[in-house]
Amino acid sequence: MQMTTFLNINQIRTTFIEFFKKYGHHYASSSSLVPGNDPSLFFVNAGIVQFKDYVRAPETSKYSRVVTCQKCVRAGGKHNDLESVGYTARHHTFFEMLGNFSFGEDNAKADFMQLIWSFLTKELFIDEDRLIVTVYHTDHETAKLWRSIAGLDDSRIIRIKTDDNFWSMGPVGPCGPCTEIFYDHGDKIPGGLPGTKDENGGRYVEIWNIVFMQYEQLNESTRVELAKRCIDTGAGLERIATVLQGVYDNYDIDLFKNLIANIEHLTKIKSVGEANFSHRIIADHLRASAFLIADGVMPSNDGRGYVLRRIMRRAMNQIHQLGCKEPVMHQLVPGLINEMGDFYKELRIRQELITYLLRNEEEKFKTTLSKGLKLLEEESKNLTSGSQLSGHIAFKLYDTYGFPFDLTQDILKKRSISINKTEFDQNMLEQQNRARQLWKGQGSNKEQLLLEKLKEEFRATEFVGYSLYQAEGIVISLIQDNQYVEYIDINQVDDNNKEFWLITNQTPFYGQSGGQMGDIGIIKNNECTIHVTDTIKLFGCTHVHICKIVSGKININAVVHMAIDKQYRTQLQIHHSATHILHAALREILGNHIIQKGSLVAYDYLRFDVSHPTSISREILTKIENRVNEIILNNTAVKLMIMPFDQAIAHGAVALFEEKYGDEVRAISIGETSDARYYSFELCGGTHVKYTGDIGAFRILSESAIAAGVRRVEAIAGKHVIKQARRNSELLDLIAEKFSVTKQTIMSKIDGIIEENNLLKKQLHQLKYNQLILCEKDIQNIADDIGTIKLVYKNIEDYDLQIVRKAVSNTTKNIKNLVMVVISNNDKKNTIIIGVSDNITNKIQANNLVKEIINYLGGSGGGSATLAQIGCQYTCKLLDLKNIICKLLAT
């Protein structure tokens, strides 16, 4: 019997990568958790995801063998482990998948099986007597190989008939049998062999899956051999760690033990009993939250951001249940980075952002958590174990208090109460339908059908506009009113001159992408002249010219001359290069946690959205602006390089998480730093100036928040800076002339006006207060007597409500037996303020009068027994309000 070597999780990861590199594998770093250009997936959930294109076309892969350690998240869509996390030994939202792959090798199967078996038994010294394998029931070749490679007899090679041992990418496409390696944790753990009725007991745990993609499914009944085979393998790092560390439960490995120890320290609660589940959930969700934020996902109310918020709030609820009053999750970040930050450097780079967002979300959630829990307690107090909460209530908690369904489910689980999911889903569907009705546009179905048809045809356009401003092209498609047409004739165009789409085989017109707006210009030949008002890019390769015909007739297959508006393109290039320099300056001055969240490169301005936890001060914005202008004045070259993606990243190129890049990429470098690195180095398909001096000048217009942890910077460059400077100078001239001062003394003049205005406001407020405050003598002249009570009823306009409240309060304090009602009208909104003398509050209370008046008028309000107010819109009922109040006082 072999002695298994104890390795911590970081050592296992490194050992795995180095072992397979030694045997001819190229190391590929983990891709972002956000899949590049793959709308079918919320998050990367397996090692093969970043290599899907190579499975379909192995010949496009630069390397035949690859090894990775891939970050994965399963918390949304088909692969959703969120409910089970914390309550089982092996469910996680975030996990690491060790993998090695073969692309296009015909005879790699035996070699891969041999390498994997050697890694487990000779490199890690796992006891091979504890290993068994499964194979697809008809895969005799793999069973034979296991007998020869590992010396396994038939009792340890289990044949499985289900799809568990046959993998496919979908109804059609690459597919093939798989073989799985299981580790036997011993008879102290209940459970049977794979394929038996007791297989879920937990004794035998899958630690490696090897998929042999050797077929292609053409349709439901036809499967053929692949010309080029692939192999996809995956081993859960956390599961391997349990074996090497002699534990059964993933949460007992070194990584989780250290994270849970930090949670115990901060919460002052030991991880025992019910608290053990809370600690496990917090530790797991901390990893998922931090890595998602590091990969550019921000908490929000939809899409990936909502899944992140669900994960965060589930952990935060557990923190609340442990009795913690202050936010805790953000305090756990340093411990996580200490465990994983050396390998995943993005955690260190984004530490400030991760910390801010976790704290901000926990503070926000705490404000609604208590209200939501109060409603949940009220609605479930009469429910017993095994009963069901209404789905309508669960939806109200989601819609009003931000409780994700699984959070409510989690809270009720401890009382063995379920939720009517059907009712919840129905409420959700109704809300979604209402939302769709709000934005559903005319002809949207036609447009969708057209786009689907275009995608099927997939007509790629050759873009020649990097080097040419003019080019010849052949018209291959004309589309108007969401329909293909053979021609567009000016004589058949109505007065509106509807836009149409024109697609050519090649074009100098840049299609809107990467934040850069599309080109405008002219397309013409001897038969027609067409104005191009915009250019868009569909499916990443088809340039569509948005056009209006000016004269003549254009036909399919016509040869046309195409010329972009050079001045318009030049300004786009200026703004695009300025955006790159701005991005670099933001990273230099604010920190490397800066992630681009969006951009717009337009003719007249640029917009750049970045991840940053707080507002950027005016002083820092000035510093950033000065740095950008410094780079511009240096007049350094803006260089284009075509290079392998891995090489670009290794040299520090900035890439967008959401983008999917090919093996060869287009990189733009600007300037150099003292350590011979580029000042700005980004992967980019846009158009740029040749030298930074071509930009001219740069000016920041504004900075604002657009979401939690996301700031927007708007700016201008080039001639627009000169235009703005001229406008500002002319405006200063007009102001100086208006006030009969020089430009240099404008500010002191304005300060004097503000000071004088404040003094006049103060005097006006005092005058208005004096008009409202009443003495005994005034009361005698204007009050109505209702029994022993005196009623003063006044209508006023354009009074500061603070003055009115103060005057009413002081009057009723000084005069007994008085009810004072003042109706103030400001911009068609009425505020009714009611004061009652303290000596009569045993009979009449201001807040009770308010309730009666609201029943009559509508509106809303409240207050105390001596002072209350109502806000309402104007209504003719106000004309009879005094009579209503008199009747109320008389009863």
From Swiss-Prot:
> Any idea which UniProt keywords this protein has?
Aminoacyl-tRNA synthetase, ATP-binding, Cytoplasm, Ligase, Metal-binding, Nucleotide-binding, Protein biosynthesis, RNA-binding, tRNA-binding, Zinc
> What's noted about domains in the record?
Consists of three domains; the N-terminal catalytic domain, the editing domain and the C-terminal C-Ala domain. The editing domain removes incorrectly charged amino acids, while the C-Ala domain, along with tRNA(Ala), serves as a bridge to cooperatively bring together the editing and aminoacylation centers thus stimulating deacylation of misacylated tRNAs.
**Source superkingdom:** Bacteria
Answer whether the UniProt record assigns the keyword Nucleotide-binding to this protein: yes
Gene designation per UniProt: alaS
Known EC number(s)? 6.1.1.7
Q: Where in the cell is it found?
A: Cytoplasm
Give GO terms: molecular function aspect only: alanine-tRNA ligase activity; aminoacyl-tRNA deacylase activity; ATP binding; tRNA binding; zinc ion binding
Catalytic activity entry:
tRNA(Ala) + L-alanine + ATP = L-alanyl-tRNA(Ala) + AMP + diphosphate
Homology family:
Belongs to the class-II aminoacyl-tRNA synthetase family.
| Free-text comment on the cofactor | Binds 1 zinc ion per subunit.
GO annotations under biological process?
A: alanyl-tRNA aminoacylation; negative regulation of DNA-templated transcription
Name-wise, this protein is Alanine--tRNA ligase
Positions bound to Zn(2+) = 576, 580, 684, 688
Q: Name one Pfam family in it.
A: tRNA_SAD
Q: Which Gene3D superfamilies match?
A: 2.40.30.130, 3.10.310.40, 3.30.54.20, Bira Bifunctional Protein, Domain 2 (3.30.930.10), Threonyl-trna Synthetase, Chain A, domain 2 (3.30.980.10)
One GO location term (cellular component): cytosol
Cofactor section: Zn(2+)
Q: Which InterPro entries match?
A: aa-tRNA-synth_II/BPL/LPL, Ala-tRNA-lgiase_IIc, Ala-tRNA-ligase_IIc_anticod-bd, Ala-tRNA-synth_IIc_core, Ala-tRNA-synth_IIc_N, Ala-tRNA_ligase, Ala_tRNA_ligase_euk/bac, DHHA1_dom
Q: Which NCBIfam families match?
A: alaS
The record describes the protein's role as: Catalyzes the attachment of alanine to tRNA(Ala) in a two-step reaction: alanine is first activated by ATP to form Ala-AMP and then transferred to the acceptor end of tRNA(Ala). Also edits incorrectly charged Ser-tRNA(Ala) and Gly-tRNA(Ala) via its editing domain.
